């Protein structure tokens, strides 16, 4: 039985006092033990009503939102607006519907059979880098390695160029600063501010956003100058038109391409960091993984057709997404007074649908904190509570890249662990934090050696 890192759950008042006194910016530290048992209830004490919603039918009500009562929260919009404007990730209503209709055709290029060569190229580059690390015996940051790898793949998919292109590498560097510094939820303000209070971003975050948008603009201008010279997602977004024949402006194009880069690499990097950490500390899992690869693939290269048959590898990734969902919280705001089940919801209330909590809920999962990939086997489907597993969201705003992310992860985990053993330094010191995505509090340092 293996229980990977998790925060200590405390009574609500103690959790609140620790956060307030220590200035802890990790929202996971604010979650009381009761959150993992309630169907719907308050997240400690705060000036604005803040509710954690766990009951699956209420989660569906909030995320499907047929009446438009629960748009994405002001906290999320304020945090991301300097980077991605009023783009598809944060917009709502008619604006979102127009953008989604325009962008959807471009996402056909994220279909895994089309994108698989980009994944293979990125994986080959990562193998070469890890081989250099193994030869030198040097230590490196697992977090940054996974971010670099997934950014390389999404750049190849969106812009037809990997991170060896200087502009793409500059975007990655600035995104790293942004991810480390952005304050989606500054907890003291969450506790004491009223709804719709604007939270100013830090100067280093705003500077990172300026750099990212500048570098994305340079990549975009290269595509605009080339005309029809590319067959990639960026070109399709450039060509997109709405029902009235209008395309995106240059600033809107930067908004949308920023979303694709952010969503296409940051979430995958989060999940892969945790998957690699878990496998690095559990040699029995790695042995099963390699045995499956030998059985399914043999000694040859891992192809697209193999990824669908690597069941254990896929279930390792699915279980990683359960315990470490990349998007820890899906915050919504109540635009009007309403009810969720028997609970009165005030206008301006912050509604926290939390995959982190839902995936560890005591009523919905057997041994919820245990890492158990076999819980996803067909013969154990009866243990699953419908609607209690939402790593890619739910409803019309479900992640359009879910299949892409899954095949990408299966390929990367299988190829890299087939060739290398990963050795994490001080694994007992690793702890999770809710930032832009679910990340370790401090960078996870590791070494690699050739697999036996």
How does the language model describe each region?
Residues 17-38, 214, 218, 300-341:
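Conserved cytochrome P450 K-helix E-x-x-R motif and the immediately C-terminal K′/meander segment
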Residues 353-381:
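Conserved cytochrome P450 K-helix/beta-meander segment immediately N-terminal to the heme-binding cysteine loop
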Residues 267-292, 403-418:
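Cytochrome P450 catalytic-core helices
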Residues 35, 123, 127, 173-177, ...:
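Cytochrome P450 proximal C-terminal region
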Residues 1-98, 118-125, 208, 336, ...:
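N-terminal membrane-proximal hinge/A-helix region immediately C-terminal to the signal-anchor transmembrane segment
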Residues 2-8, 72-77, 95, 111-270, ...:
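Cytochrome P450 heme-thiolate monooxygenase catalytic core
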Residues 7-11, 116-120, 171-177, 228-235, ...:
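Cytochrome P450 I-helix active-site segment
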